[in-house]
Amino acid sequence: GVTVGWGSAPYDKVSFTPDGEDDAETWFTHEFIERGIVISADGSVSVELEPEFNEYGGTSRANDIIKTNSGYTVVGNMSTSIPDDRQDNIDDNCDNEDEPTSVCINLLNSNITRGLFNKRAVKWELDESLNITSVEELGMALTPDEGEAEDDAFTSTALAVNSNGTIVGSSNTRYYKNDDTILTMPVYFKDG
């Protein structure tokens, strides 16, 4: 049947000369860190689930799919923004002087506990021909205060959907004994 998943962009071999150096170095770069994809049963059609926020490539994941009366429902997550503090990290470090910008973005994303991007659980609706007909952001189990939203990335993700449309996943939320402690807990999404 129709399947979903995600992967990185293909890597390109590029020649890059760091500032202050005379000799070019070989680097491997890619356009985005991860992208969700839907693939038809016979493999002849593939649909990338590009995030609405795609600066530095953005991110998306497709975790589950179900057949519906009018097509398919796919759930996962996608990037929605970059917090100010993370953007400052990018501006300070990813200047295309020591390494290609995309390499720096990938390293920063890997080295920061919650990554560079704010990500939200999402539901995509596709028709029988795998055309995307709607994209619905499903929300998160907490509302970050202004300071938190500037400093940290927050994530929710939809992991599975059943035939009744119930969507389950995980979300950052506050620890009940201490509002300053952010945890990731299992959730279900109802009405976004």
Where are these regions (language model features)?
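Residue-level hotspots at or immediately adjacent to binding/recognition sites across diverse folds
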Residues: 1-192
